[in-house]
Amino acid sequence: MADYSTVPPPSSGSAGGGGGGGVNDAFKDALQRARQIAAKIGGDAGTSLNSNDYGYGGQKRPLEDGDQPDAKKVPPQNDSFGAQLPPMHQQQRSVMTEEYKVPDGMVGFIIGRGGEQISRIQQESGCKIQIAPDSGGLPERSCMLTGTPESVQSAKRLLDQIVEKGRPAPGFHHGDGPGNAVQEIMIPASKAGLVIGKGGETIKQLQERAGVKMVMIQDGPQNTGADKPLRITGDPYKVQQAKEMVLELIRDQGGFREVRNEYGSRIGGNEGIDVPIPRFAVGIVIGRNGEMIKKIQNDAGVRIQFKPDDGTTPDRIAQITGPPDRCQHAAEIITDLLRSVQAGNPGGPGPGGRGRGRGQGNWNMGPPGGLQEFNFIVPTGKTGLIIGKGGETIKSISQQSGARIELQRNPPPNADPNMKLFTIRGTPQQIDYARQLIEEKIGGPVNPLGPPVPHGPHGVPGPHGPPGPPGPGTPMGPYNPAPYNPGPPGPAPHGPPAPYAPQGWGNAYPHWQQQAPPDPAKAGTDPNSAAWAAYYAHYYQQQAQPPPAAPAGAPTTTQTNGQGDQQNPAPAGQVDYTKAWEEYYKKMGQAVPAPAGAPPGGQPDYSAAWAEYYRQQAAYYAQTSPQGMPQHPPAPQGQ
């Protein structure tokens, strides 16, 4: 048996024999823990540790403690080795670096816009991520993950989630081009118009921002109420970005949580603001040849565009694009312009004028300035471009400009059959705006027939009545630059137009020459002078001369005109003066000698047509006001 007399006890301060056994058990426990830690680090678990190597001097564990269980082996009070092992192990674990592969096409999605995505991953996992600058032509790219094992595993998990989220979904396939992919997402039917936008503006902006191609697929133009697939084609990462942008657009617009300015538009970025413009005032904002809107754009440093619409709303939306402060300045300029027009209107605005951001109000004001009329001609082949299918184009132009546009079905005499006459009625601004829209449709300028003519005191159209004397001239201005002295046109199949200052068709183009007014000195050279003389004699005498007594036995037979068309008989109880009027015209025609050498039948004879017209007028005025129109022809002059 070994001699242990020279070995000092483990602890001199222990009382009794039980204290030494407890210390030995604690030492055994510490030794066992050290072996376990060494095994984790990579050492041999069976290697025994020499206590002398760790500063225990000549202390030796008593042999009697060898058979004690490990649970009683605790480290001694002066054991510094056991306290240092956990920090050493933690320090070794914090410098772990691992290479991780990610798909090359998903790198941009992992990094995110402005590096937001990768910054979030590093912050949540506590792991540093470094991505190789390129893949070297391989389908995967290397990422170096540095951190503790737990942080590295967390970073891997987050990266896998992002890659899985960006993987092709059902309906996603690679396109024909290299690196292109196609994905289809379903858009609710109620949001399809929101994604497309007015005139396709929204979907174009999405394509430009994401760098992809988007196509909304639908079976036909009719709205079936079913969801529509949106096909996105492009780089896989860009396709995913475009998908997120579309979903964000639908989500934002559906919630109506945008911050809006005083004009009701969203604020932020360079999106600009939308300003509602009364439809009749659109021409005022645009100005003649676009001068006003160009001036506003130059002064404010913005871009102004009118959004297309269906013409059902009373206002049109002017979209102002640019910096927020400049957009606000341009909106104020437009508002001031409209206010000045409103204040200058003779009728004045109605109650509740439009306030800036304080309700919509109501203009209740007519178009500024007097109504004018503008005639122009276009080649027959381009008439369809102005009218459109079912009249949609001309209706749209009329709604956008606020002017009334008509195609004259009955052109003036001697008109060129290859040209068509159009008439625009409205304010100068409306006429100018409508003219611009028409010129855009036909791809060139129109051929005007004189400046716009205002409706003066005699300017209210009537039911195909005879023309009156020309109304007073209009003051010269930007929309009426030249003096204008029109003459009455020749008689038309349905009678002359109403008594207003008519435009002359012969002052601009020779192929629309009009008939000159009758001149007494040249009466012998005009075959229609008899009709004009009768007309003027009747016109100037209808108010001054009282109607004479109706002669007895006046004929009431049915007459026919020179073209063989049967005329309607006079109403029952009314006196028919058709024969008397015909005799009057015949006498007037015989009083004026025909020019020498004039070919017979060179000009049509409208005597019968005029007689029928005056007979109808006599019947009409006799029913409404017996004193309103003379019931007999004037006495032939010079007879």
UniProtKB/Swiss-Prot annotation:
Residues with Phosphothreonine modification: T148, T427
UniProt entry keywords in alphabetical sequence: Acetylation, DNA-binding, Methylation, Nucleus, Phosphoprotein, Repeat, Transcription, Transcription regulation, Ubl conjugation
Biased composition (Basic and acidic residues): 61-73
Modification comment: Ubiquitinated. This targets the protein for proteasome-mediated degradation.
Keyword Cell inner membrane: no
Post-translational modification N-acetylalanine, affected residues: A2
Pfam hit, one: KH_1
Location relative to the cell: Nucleus
UniProt feature, compositional bias: Pro residues: 463-500
Modified residues (Phosphoserine): S48, S51, S135, S625
SMART domains the record matches: KH
Listed Gly residues bias regions: 14-23, 345-360
Stretches assigned to the KH domain: 95-159, 180-246, 270-334, 371-438
Gene Ontology cellular-component terms listed: cytoplasm; nucleus; synapse
Comp. bias (Low complexity): 551-568
GO biological process: cellular response to lipopolysaccharide; hematopoietic stem cell proliferation; positive regulation of gene expression; positive regulation of Schwann cell migration; regulation of transcription by RNA polymerase II; response to nutrient levels; somatic stem cell division
Residues recorded as bearing Omega-N-methylarginine in the entry: R316, R354, R356, R358
Highest taxon, organism lineage: Eukaryota
Region annotation (Disordered) ranges: 1-27, 40-88, 341-360, 442-527, 543-574
A molecular function GO annotation: RNA polymerase II cis-regulatory region sequence-specific DNA binding
Function comment: Regulates MYC expression by binding to a single-stranded far-upstream element (FUSE) upstream of the MYC promoter. May act both as activator and repressor of transcription.
Subunit structure as annotated in this protein's UniProt entry: Found in a complex with PUF60 and far upstream element (FUSE) DNA segment. Interacts with PUF60 and JTV1.
Protein name per the record: Far upstream element-binding protein 1
Organism, as annotated: Rattus norvegicus (Rat)
